[in-house]
Amino acid sequence: MKKLITTSALLILFFNLSVFAASNSSSKTKGWWNVPYPGTFDTSQLVNEQAFIRVKGNKLVDEKGTTFIFRGVNIADPDKLRTENQWSLSLFEELKDWGANVVRLPIHPISWQKNGKEEYFKIIDQAVIWANSLDMYLIIDWHSIGYLPDELFQHPMYDTTKKETFAFWKDVSFRYAGVATIAVYELFNEPTDQGGRAGKANWHDWKTINEQLIDVIYAHDKNVIPLIAGFNWAYDLRPIKQHPVARKGIAYAVHPYPQKAKPKVKSKQNFFDLWESVWGFAAKDYPVIATELGWVSADGLGAHIPVINDGSYGPQIMEFMQERNISWVVWAFDPLWSPTMIKDWNFTPTEQGSFFKKQLQQHK
């Protein structure tokens, strides 16, 4: 008898759960025929008519054909900043005061998934409005680390899929088509196979997937600059010597942190020679944007490979990039994400923050 009652109870529970699941699924699709199509960004909210930045040969130029160099900073993921009550116009005003003409938004897949695209678009919309009001540009960065063709990634915060990545750029390029403030789409932050731990990187596959992403973007908007990274965590561009990405209007990204180059003798010329051979050469034929760079002392906050340096890196990398018209965006304007540019939310500069602030203000 006891067994019969237990079995009956289980059957009732299973029935109730099945009904709940069916009704819950129904609530998600109820009235699906009335769900509107996605909308584009309302440009009437913008106060400045900014020039589109375009690719001309190996340079970035404005609409008058004048060479344009992006000089700016990375902020933390906007969702992180919003959660910490630091997402505001005043943050962008501080960046403008430092001399930045561009802000990179590192959008992590986990952050995008947590919010959903409609909610995250509200955050990006705010960035567009604030940046436009201050005549600054934006780089939208799909901030994943790993090897997308194999869908293997360095940490759960970077986990994504090919489908999600394509959908992200499809939706972003549709929403912000024709918005000059968003100048650059960085297709994938740092491709790496982690020494084979995330599969085996193959340039042909990586080249193909980037070309397909660019085709999706260009189908919606041809007024943006697709930015493509090389292997070794966005450091090695040597494969493009023989097999460049076969699309027009593109630029290449590099993250030349100090410990990436490892000369036997640490002289300026030896660093220059190594940088030139691995990524600097690309600036002869294409625009190059160093979308992450920076350093921290060995005993500094968050010191880790490959960003540790005694400070000699700063002047050297700036000289190298200036000689080649390479744009640059420092990591990171946040007191926690190392190498940090600020010590606190009073915007007290760190060692590298002080150095790069002087560099930025030379071009205000």
Task: List PLM regions with ranges.
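Positively charged n-region of N-terminal signal peptides that target proteins for export
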Residues: 1-4
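Bacterial N-terminal signal peptides
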Residues: 8-18
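Extracellular glycoside hydrolase catalytic/binding regions
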Residues: 52, 84, 156, 166-184, ...
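Acidic/histidine-rich helix-loop elements
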Residues: 64, 68-89, 112-116, 153-157, ...
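An active-site-proximal structural segment forming one wall of the substrate-binding cleft
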Residues: 83-102, 106-107, 113-144, 150-187, ...
